[in-house]
Amino acid sequence: MGFSELFTNADGRLSTTASIQFWGFVAATGVLLYSVYLDKPYVPEMFSTFLFACVGTAATKGVANALSQRREQGKEQGREQGREQE
């Protein structure tokens, strides 16, 4: 398994969602380690907020893609039904 497989699709193209999740995890780990090193009292809140932002971005993109695909399928079915009625 190559390093690039962590954030690309099966065909080798860059995956936006996987990239956001992977680099978000890397950044969150860096923020956590740096905050622990500085001995800050707000580490859990900052870390969880950052992770929610990273996960939320990818999840929102997934929901938008699913709704878009459903809308396209509905349009195609409507066209097919219109052709059958003619």
From Swiss-Prot:
Cellular location(s): Cell membrane
InterPro entries with a match to the protein in the record: DUF2644
Keywords: Cell membrane, Membrane, Transmembrane, Transmembrane helix
Keyword field contains Transmembrane helix: yes
Recorded GO CC terms: plasma membrane
Residues passing through the membrane, by range: 20-38, 47-63
Keyword Signal: no
A Pfam short name: DUF2644
Membrane topology: Multi-pass membrane protein
Chief localization: membrane
Region ranges (Disordered): 67-86
Basic and acidic residues composition-biased segments: 69-86
Protein name: Uncharacterized protein HI_1495
Source organism: Haemophilus influenzae (strain ATCC 51907 / DSM 11121 / KW20 / Rd)
Upper taxonomic lineage: Bacteria, Pseudomonadati, Pseudomonadota, Gammaproteobacteria, Pasteurellales
